[in-house]
Amino acid sequence: MNQEYDMMAHKPIFPLLMKMAIPPMISMLIQSKDNIIDSIFVAKLGEEALTALSLAFPLQNLSLAFSVGLGVAINALIAKSLGASDEKQANYISDHGIFLAILHSLLFVFIGIFLMKPFFLMFTTNPTVLDYAITYGSIVITFTFGSIIHITIEKMFQATGNMMIPMFLQGIGAIVNIILDPILIFGINGYLEFGVAGAAIATIIGQMTACLLAIILFRKTSRIKVSLKNFKPNAQIIKNIYSIAIPSGVMTSLPSILVALLNSLLATVSQTAIAFFGIYFKLQSFIYMPANGL
C-alpha cells in the first residue's frame, strides 16, 4: 500500500480534502491557460489576429472539456477499484482510458482537418480573420492528442492520491508555451517568425512536452500499470466510463457552447465586439476552471 493510498484510507476527511483539492484546482487553472497566453502575445499582431483566437477559443475549450470528462470518468472508476483493493481491475480500466483517449484524439484530427472552415464561416466573412482562425484552430485541434492523453494520465495519477505530479506537469507545459510563444510568433533576427501559426505551434509543443513527461513519470512512479498489448475492449467498462464522461463533458462544455452562440450574435455587431468578449471570457475562465478541480 503506497503512501498516497494509505493517506486516502485513513486521514480525516477535511484535511484530506484540503490537501487533495488545492493541487487539482491549480492544475485546472493552468489547463485553461493555452489560448489566454497565446492571446496576450497575438494581440500585438492586431485586432484581427486577436479576434481569430477568440473565435477558436470555444472549440479549443470544447476539446478540453471532453478530455476532462473522460479523465473524470477514468479517475472515478480507478479510485473505486483501488478502494475495493482490486488493482487488476484498476489496471484494466486504465487500459481503456488510454484506448479511448487515442480514439478521441483521432476524432479531433478529423474535426481539425475537415470542419475548421465551416465552423469559422458561421462567425466571420473577414478573409484575414478567417485565415488566422483556420490556421490557429487547425493546428491546436488536429494535434490536441498530446493534451488529451496527458489529461487522461493526469486523472490516473489523481485516482491514486498523487496530486502533485499533475500540477507539476501542467506547470511545465505552461512554461514551455510562455517561452516559445514570443519566439515562434515574432521570431529571432528574422528567423522562426510564424505569426498566429507560431502561437498554435508553441501551444502544441507545450502540450506534447507535458504529455511525454506524463508518460515517463507514470511508467516509473505509478502503482497503476497500462499495457495495450493483447488489449480487448470491454463493452461494460466502456459503458461505465461514458455514463460518467458524457454528463461531465457536457456540463464542462456548456460555457464553450454559450461563447460560440454569443460570438454568432456579436458577429452581427462587429469583429471588435468578438475580440473584447473573448478577452472577458478567458479571464472569467480563471474563476470556474479551478472550481472544476475541486
Name the predicted role of every residue range:
Residues 1-21, 78-145, 191-246:
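Short alpha-helical transmembrane segments in multi-pass integral membrane proteins
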Residues 9-29, 137-141, 164-171, 213, ...:
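Hydrophobic faces of transmembrane alpha-helices in multi-pass small-molecule transporters and flippases
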Residues 15-75, 79, 246-266:
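Signature of the first transmembrane helix
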Residues 25, 29, 33, 37, ...:
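Generic alpha-helical transmembrane segments of integral inner-membrane proteins
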Residues 33-51, 120-127, 183-193, 253-286:
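Helix-terminus/linker motif at the lipid-water interface of multi-pass membrane proteins
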Residues 50-110, 114, 147-166, 258, ...:
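Small-residue-rich hydrophobic transmembrane alpha-helices
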